[in-house]
């Protein structure tokens, strides 16, 4: 996920420190999430230098797309441009088609017509593999995250492929719930924390606003009261 939502505030120095922190914490893989953007060249140079492998999503996430002729022409060129730009990096471990779209299309979330299911398969199981065959046949391709290998074959199966498990956060389940599973590869899970006091000071004037139940704190909580209660 981008280290800054205001991309102009990003810097090579800040990103290097974050990646160095990852290495020191014994991370070995960095995932570039499909809901963000393709990083600059120096991001991959730093990963090369530090020995961090990169899981690279293509920039598609949490949606469905209508594969019109104009859109297909556009994304084909986007794929080719970024594949050619990044394929030489030793840190590039795999290409991934999208974030969470196979799972949700399989569940018919966001889907309003059958052609969107067809277009999903065309984009991630035909077009991208064909382009990779021509321009980077050596790098592994994974159709989605999570996935069990594609074609809507139980894409969030805990025993195959990779899994996104958010039932502790979104489902209000207790932390010991994690101990019930032995995921083959858990590529997403987590729980929100509150920001540090230094950050809170930037958007509060009255100490009364520091209360987590205050109006100001609730408005800065993306999930409003329900997420505040979980934390």
Sequence positions of predicted segments:
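Active-site-adjacent substrate/metal-binding segments within catalytic domains
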Residues: 1-63, 69-94, 219-230
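Substrate-binding clefts and catalytic carboxylate motifs of secreted carbohydrate-active enzymes
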Residues: 95, 130-133, 145, 149-156, ...
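Short, charged/polar micro-motifs that form catalytic or ligand-binding hotspots
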Residues: 33, 118, 176
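Short, solvent-exposed loop/turn and secondary-structure capping segments
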Residues: 9, 42-43, 106-108, 196-198
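Active-site flanking residues adjacent to catalytic metal/cofactor-binding acidic residues
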Residues: 56, 99, 187
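Active-site neighborhood of glycoside hydrolase catalytic domains
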Residues: 49-51, 64-156
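Active-site-proximal loop/turn and secondary-structure-junction residues that shape catalytic pockets
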Residues: 36-38, 60-62, 101, 147, ...
């Amino acid at each position: 996920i981008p280290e800054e939502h205001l991309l102009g505030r990003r810097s090579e120095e800040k990103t290097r420190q974050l990646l160095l922190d990852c290495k020191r914490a014994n991370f070995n893989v960095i995932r570039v999430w499909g809901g963000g953007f393709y990083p600059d060249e120096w991001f991959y140079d730093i990963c090369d230098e530090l020995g961090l492998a990169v899981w690279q999503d293509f920039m598609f996430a949490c949606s469905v797309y209508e594969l019109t002729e104009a859109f297909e022409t556009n994304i084909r060129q986007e794929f080719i441009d970024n594949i050619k730009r990044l394929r030489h990096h030793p840190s590039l471990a795999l290409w991934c088609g999208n974030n969470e779209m196979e799972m949700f299309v399989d569940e018919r979330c966001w889907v309003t017509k059958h052609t969107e299911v067809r277009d999903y398969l065309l984009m991630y199981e035909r077009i991208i593999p064909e382009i990779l065959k021509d321009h980077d046949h050596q790098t592994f391709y994974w159709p989605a995250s999570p996935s069990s290998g594609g074609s809507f074959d139980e894409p969030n199966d805990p025993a195959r492929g990779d899994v996104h498990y958010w039932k502790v956060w979104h489902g209000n389940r207790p932390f010991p719930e994690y101990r019930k599973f032995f995921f083959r590869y858990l590529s997403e899970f987590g729980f929100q924390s509150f920001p540090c006091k230094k950050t809170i000071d930037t958007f509060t004037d009255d100490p009364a606003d520091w209360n987590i139940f205050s109006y100001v704190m609730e408005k800065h909580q993306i999930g409003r009261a329900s997420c505040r209660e979980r934390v």
